[in-house]
Amino acid sequence: MNLHYGLHPATVVALEGDPESRQRIKVRLDWLAATDGGDPPEAWAVIVTPYADADQGFQMLPEVDSTVVVGFLAGHTDHPYVIGSVWNGEADAPERFTDANDKRVIQTRSGSRLEFDDTPGAVAVRISTPGGHEITMDDAGTNIEIAASSGARIELTAAGGVTIEAASTVDVTAAMVTVDAPMSTFNGVVTCDTLIAKGGGVISPMYTPGAGNVW
């Protein structure tokens, strides 16, 4: 029996159908010529991952037809282990390589993306979808921004505290809602269809709608 040590390229053939239900994937060993002159041999390979345990772990499988790197247990080709994937020149990385190496990226086939940006002075974490939705946590601006593809945007910037709590319901439906205040306090029940007070305003411990109904 010929033993094969070291690392070797392989092509992913299938992610399903492991006859032993061991969460292995099928790979084709293109570099290993079949003894009968036929197609290159295929084998079920164990995936090496940073974390694997019962009903938990790090699960990111390579695509069918992608190139992976395999090693063999004690050199036996019938016991391959997939130790990683490679960009083979036909498939590009999601981000261009730079010597500064400021960005770490996880990007899916559709373009959903998690980006860690270590650019000096502009450190940020971004989560985005191919449809244009994005969440940005920006250390440079000390803010958190949620942006929808429609152009809607929520931005949180606070030197103090921002707290929103709801045991049941918080609803805001607007044609226009503007609160710009050194102080706004609401306790108890506030119900109003129309209340317009400018200039002197309304100051009273008791108020009900209607002319003169201020005590």
Question: Language-model segments: what does each one mean?
Answer:
Residues 28-30, 50, 109-110:
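A structural micro-motif recognizing beta-strand termini
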Residues 51-58:
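Short alpha-helix capping/helix-loop boundary micro-motifs
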Residues 10-14:
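Generic structural motif
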Residues 35-49:
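Short, basic/aromatic beta-hairpin or loop at an interaction surface
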Residues 4, 9, 19, 59-66, ...:
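Right-handed beta-helix
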Residues 29-33, 190:
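Short, small-residue-rich loop/turn micro-motifs
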Residues 19-28:
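Short aromatic-glycine-enriched beta-strand elements
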